[in-house]
């Protein structure tokens, strides 16, 4: 199975996924795609000899740009790992229940447009939540609205800053995200 990982940022999850599947006989990380040429995730992918492609935001919604690329790399499954663009409907339809996303909160709380990265952790802090977590979900046409596949939580203390909350949530991502992907793929 050929997987494409879509990224916009530093790529810690991307690298973790690449490492997890490095010796997997049935899964190949075939492509890392970013909307940003300066995304450090591209450097991480190249370190493992994974092909990388940049499709600027202005071209990302163009079916004639994106779909031939998916066909060229024979992409069977897509993982959004810190990808900050809305995925176009034609791609969601083409990869129905074969595209998942990670979100840095316990959805449905703190999801939707504008809820990413530190914005989420600041909102969790402002609300005085007693726990935070991560959600892996299918990608749908509703931002962060797809069916939930898995959630993992961790307790918070009143003294936790948004940075502390982010660090706790990031540990969950590193521990669980690749395993959830593997489990989902094994059940396809």
Regions picked out by a protein language model, each given a short descriptive name:
Residues 1-188:
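One-carbon transfer enzymes
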């Amino acid at each position: 199975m050929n997987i494409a990982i879509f990224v916009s940022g530093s790529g810690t999850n991307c690298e973790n996924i690449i490492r997890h599947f490095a010796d997997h006989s049935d899964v190949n990380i075939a492509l890392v795609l970013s909307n940003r040429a300066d995304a450090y995730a591209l450097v991480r992918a190249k370190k493992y000899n994974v092909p990388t492609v940049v499709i600027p935001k202005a071209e990302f919604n163009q079916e004639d740009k994106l779909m031939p690329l998916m066909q060229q790399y024979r992409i069977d499954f897509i993982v959004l790992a810190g990808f900050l663009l809305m995925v176009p409907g034609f791609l969601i339809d083409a990869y129905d229940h074969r595209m998942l996303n990670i979100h840095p909160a316990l959805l449905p709380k703190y999801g939707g447009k504008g809820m990413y990265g530190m914005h989420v952790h600041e909102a969790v802090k402002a609300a005085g939540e007693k726990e935070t977590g991560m959600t892996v979900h299918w990608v749908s046409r509703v931002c962060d609205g797809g069916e939930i596949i898995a959630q993992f939580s961790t307790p918070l203390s009143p003294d936790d800053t948004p940075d502390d909350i982010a660090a706790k949530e990031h540990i969950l991502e590193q521990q669980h995200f690749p395993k959830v992907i593997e489990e989902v793929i094994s059940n396809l």
